[in-house]
Structure formats: structure tokens, C-alpha cells
Regions:
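Terminal substrate-recognition subdomain of acyl/acetyltransferases
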Residues: 2, 162-168
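Conserved hydrophobic beta-strand within the GNAT/NAT acetyltransferase core sheet
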Residues: 91-94, 125-129
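Active-site acidic-Proline motif in GNAT/NAT acetyltransferases
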Residues: 97-99, 103, 131-132
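Conserved active-site tyrosine of GNAT-family acetyltransferases
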Residues: 140, 145
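Acetyl-CoA-dependent GNAT
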Residues: 3-6, 10-16, 21-99, 107-116, ...
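Conserved beta-strand-loop-alpha-helix junction that forms the acyl-donor binding cleft
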Residues: 127-137, 154-159
Length: 168
């Protein structure tokens, strides 16, 4: 029997390749059929190893979920970008490699991200979800999120609605 340890920690530059791989596989799984194909491919290609290295070294707060010493997921967090909403923090992204989804690891990473925001003086948090992403909506509603705002984003000429979920 093999015992795998899990750890959530701040990302290091040496994690960039693993995070880029998680980003690619999880985004393709999550957004194929939702985002226009070309837009999705361009967004994935833009987030290469060099991009993640810069993000980690600069001001972006990136947390990783390590399982058995390998990066299985990541979250990016920071200040709430919508000043008309009172929440102090925002989870910009939270993604896991597909083989780790549905096992409770996403919830663990999400709770750690929220705790990191609180500890950093950013109480309350927002998460924006595309309205067509049923799996993400189910995840955040099951985590206790309240639908507090709506917006839209345009990808390669296609406008998609998004929902903001609030967490205390």
C-alpha cells in the first residue's frame, strides 16, 4: 500500500512547468464546448512555463496542491477586482488535473485559498464562474457560495455570461 501525502503551499518558480500542464489539461476539459476553439487554444498557449514563472516571481499569489510530491492543482488569489462589491479577496482561478477532480481535493484547495485571503487581511471572497460551466457552478454552490452579481466576457466574438459567487 502506498501512502500519498497532500500539501497546499505557495508556488515556487520550479513549479511553473507542472502548473502549466495542470492549466492546459484542466482548461481544455472545462472549457471545450463552452469557449470558442481558437480562443481556448490561444488562452492555453499564452499560459506557458515562462508565463507561470513570471507570475510566480512577481505579485501573483499562486497556491499549489501537491499530491505525493507532484503538483495536482493550483489556485490564484488576490484582491477583489470589482470595487462595487464588498468582498476583500477573490479566487481568480482554481483548477485540478482531471484525475484528481471529484475526490475532495478541490474543496481542500478552495478552503486553503480562502484562509490565505483572510490571513492576508482580505475577508470575504468572490469567485467568477462562466454560466455555462455547470460543474464549476455545482462546486461553488455546494461550497456555500451565494450568487451576488452577474457580468459577461467576450471570447473571440462570443459573449458569455458569468456569475459572481460570494463567500464569507
Amino acid at each position: 500500500m502506498t501512502l500519498l501525502t497532500t500539501e497546499i503551499r505557495r508556488a515556487r518558480a520550479s513549479d511553473a512547468a507542472a502548473i502549466a500542464a495542470v492549466h492546459e489539461t484542466s482548461w481544455i476539459q472545462a472549457y471545450t464546448g463552452i469557449l470558442p476553439h481558437r480562443a481556448l487554444q490561444a488562452m492555453v498557449a499564452r499560459r506557458d512555463v515562462a508565463w507561470w514563472t513570471r507570475a510566480i516571481r512577481q505579485s501573483t499569489r499562486v497556491l499549489t496542491l501537491d499530491i505525493g510530491g507532484h503538483v495536482a492543482g493550483y489556485a490564484t488569489i488576490g484582491p477583489n477586482r470589482v470595487k462595487s462589491l464588498p468582498q476583500g479577496g477573490e479566487v481568480y482561478e482554481l483548477y485540478l488535473s482531471p484525475q484528481y477532480q471529484g475526490l475532495g481535493f478541490g474543496r481542500k484547495l478552495f478552503l486553503a485559498a480562502r484562509q490565505d485571503l483572510r490571513t492576508g487581511g482580505r475577508p470575504g471572497c468572490l469567485v467568477w464562474v462562466l454560466e455555462e460551466n455547470a460543474a464549476a457552478i455545482r462546486f461553488y454552490e455546494n461550497a456555500g457560495g451565494r450568487d451576488v452579481a452577474e457580468g459577461s466576457e467576450t471570447f473571440d466574438g462570443r459573449t458569455l455570461n458569468k456569475i459572481a459567487y460570494s463567500f464569507d
